[in-house]
Amino acid sequence: MENIIEIKNLSFKYNTTKAIFSDLNLTIKKGEITTLLGKNGCGKSTLIKLLSKNITNYTGNIFLENKELKSYSLKELATKLSIVYQNNITPQEITVFDMVSFARLPYQNIFFYKQTKEDIEKINFALKETDLIDYKNTIVSELSGGQLQRVYIAMCLAQDTEIIILDEPTTFLDIKYQKSIMKLVKRLNQELHLTIIMVLHDINQAITYSDNIVALLDGEIIKNDKAHTLLDEELLNKIYDTEIKIENNKVISW
């Protein structure tokens, strides 16, 4: 499997703070689900900001499809990579269809927006893939939390990017909707061959739905391997700095 993202010797720090990353090296495989794990402050959110060009004052290199990330315009990057953030500002009095339509903006003339036949086809495809086609005319404020998360994922599909980043996609959802969202993510990865990068706190979800795990501790990668290899109490205790118990291939307490 070829690499779609390569990070080489990357270093970064926020103003006067100590370095978040020092000579970080990481590769993300094309067409796989890679999950970033670690306790708060380990660098997960910063890594997402780096990949999305929200942070650019780093040293080292980030390559996306063998091209230096800094050389991408934001509009060009938006055709390659889409993100569902943990805390999104959601317009309330707008239909699901119209909200998903916003995802087509990277393909439009900045001075003149006109929805094309291709735009409508991409939007409807995204709604069907996320089981929202029957809700296309529903006002967003009427949706449940799980349905709203599907809308954000539909926006990524309509944006037509090969890479999707999901920052805590199951946060604030009940167990039923958590499972539903994770199954959707896995299906989209398998059927559409998308490269998906997730940030998760739930270790069992990470093991169940990921191909690869990248575990961070104080800005360093201490594990970058197949998901099942995370079932190691000593390793998990180190990652989270707390006692974690595993039973029958599941984390039962932490």
Give the label of every model feature segment.
Residues 1-7, 11-23, 71-73, 91:
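A short, flexible loop at the N-terminus of ABC-type nucleotide-binding domains that lies
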Residues 52:
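Helix-to-loop junction immediately C-terminal to a conserved catalytic motif
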Residues 60-68, 77:
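Conserved ABC transporter NBD signature motif
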Residues 139-143:
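Conserved ABC ATPase signature
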Residues 239-254:
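ABC ATPase nucleotide-binding domains
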